[in-house]
């Protein structure tokens, strides 16, 4: 595949949600027959959240695929590995178009309080620019964002790194 993904992890609970996840799983299997070079593995949602905490690198260069409810759970769980949900961006791809957005909601309770992390919005734009064929611009945005975060000077409270005290 062009994107470099090695495996799709489909997340269900079809042992309990037989009808809805049964429909989802049938669609996954049908699609997998068209893309035989990409591996497919099924995880139940409860086990997937545990694996994301214990062994997140297992899912590098892979696609996590599920229904909206389970992906809401997964995105919250996984966001802890990268700082907060404020850093998670997403892309929804169709046959001819794509849409990019932060994974978090609008958080109106934080309006005007200078607390909201802009990283997901910035990186959503970087991913969109890459989709539009401007990979060099996308790389520059990702690099600049990474540099600012690593500098640890201009970050929101959810990313602020403080050294552990000698007692820790």
Give the residues covered by each predicted segment.
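Conserved small/polar residues in nucleotide/adenosyl-binding loops
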Residues: 161-168
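Glycine-rich phosphate/nucleotide-binding loop
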Residues: 51-152
């Amino acid at each position: 595949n062009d994107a470099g993904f090695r495996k799709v992890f489909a997340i269900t609970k079809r042992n309990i949600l037989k009808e809805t996840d049964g429909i989802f799983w049938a669609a996954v299997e049908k699609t997998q027959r068209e893309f035989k070079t990409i591996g497919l593995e099924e995880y139940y949602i409860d086990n997937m959240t545990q694996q994301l905490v214990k062994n997140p690198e297992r899912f590098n260069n892979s696609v996590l695929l599920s229904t909206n409810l389970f992906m809401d759970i997964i995105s919250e769980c996984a966001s802890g590995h990268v700082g907060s949900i404020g850093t998670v961006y997403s892309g929804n791809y169709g046959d001819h178009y794509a849409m990019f957005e932060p994974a978090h909601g609008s958080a109106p309770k934080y309006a005007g309080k200078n607390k909201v992390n802009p990283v997901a919005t910035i990186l959503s734009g970087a991913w969109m620019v890459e989709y539009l064929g401007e990979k060099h611009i996308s790389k520059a945005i990702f690099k600049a964002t990474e540099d600012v975060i690593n500098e640890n000077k201009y970050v929101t409270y959810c990313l602020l790194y403080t050294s552990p005290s000698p007692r820790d």
